[in-house]
Amino acid sequence: MPTINQLVRKGREKRRKKSKAPALQFVYSRVGRNAGKLRQVPKGNPQKRGVCVAVRTMTPKKPNSALRKIARVRLTNGIEVTAYIPGEGHNLQEHSVVLVRGGRVKDLPGVRYHIVRGALDAKGVENRRQGRSKYGTKKPKQ
């Protein structure tokens, strides 16, 4: 237990909070002697652009059973991540340019990111009536 004098002199050290989407926190330095090097920024980015390296399926943990669609994406900062493709059906293939956001998939180990539907090369989900904004679907004509 520190004395009051020790606390006045040193103070308490803040606990560093671990990011749930670390790949979105790295950016390339553009200027200075660290130009071209990766550096970590405290807030990071809400989304990042990337290119699909591989598109495949994955089986979830017990007790679930399915073939979940995932893509391996190389982000603009050079980091490669595994991202989930939400919704029914997709048009993604190798070399597709996608927008990646944070957000894990609970039953897929190692999948901490989602692909944003309706942005860049990822088309919105066809014939979706409810929750359209999450799947990049336009309002249907009456």
Swiss-Prot record:
Stored Gene3D superfamilies: Nucleic acid-binding proteins (2.40.50.140)
Keyword Transmembrane helix: no
Residues modified to 3-methylthioaspartic acid: D107
Matches recorded under Pfam families: Ribosom_S12_S23
Record keywords: Methylation, Ribonucleoprotein, Ribosomal protein, RNA-binding, rRNA-binding, tRNA-binding
Bias kind Basic residues: ranges: 9-20
Annotated spans, Disordered: 1-21
GO cellular component, one term: small ribosomal subunit
Keyword Ribosomal protein annotated: yes
GO biological process, one term: translation
An example molecular function term from Gene Ontology annotations: tRNA binding
Subunit structure and binding partners: Part of the 30S ribosomal subunit. Contacts proteins S8 and S17. May interact with IF1 in the 30S initiation complex.
NCBIfam families (alphabetical): rpsL_bact
Stated role: With S4 and S5 plays an important role in translational accuracy. Interacts with and stabilizes bases of the 16S rRNA that are involved in tRNA selection in the A site and with the mRNA backbone. Located at the interface of the 30S and 50S subunits, it traverses the body of the 30S subunit contacting proteins on the other side and probably holding the rRNA structure together. The combined cluster of proteins S8, S12 and S17 appears to hold together the shoulder and platform of the 30S subunit.
Protein family membership: Belongs to the universal ribosomal protein uS12 family.
Full protein name: Small ribosomal subunit protein uS12
Gene name linked to the record: rpsL
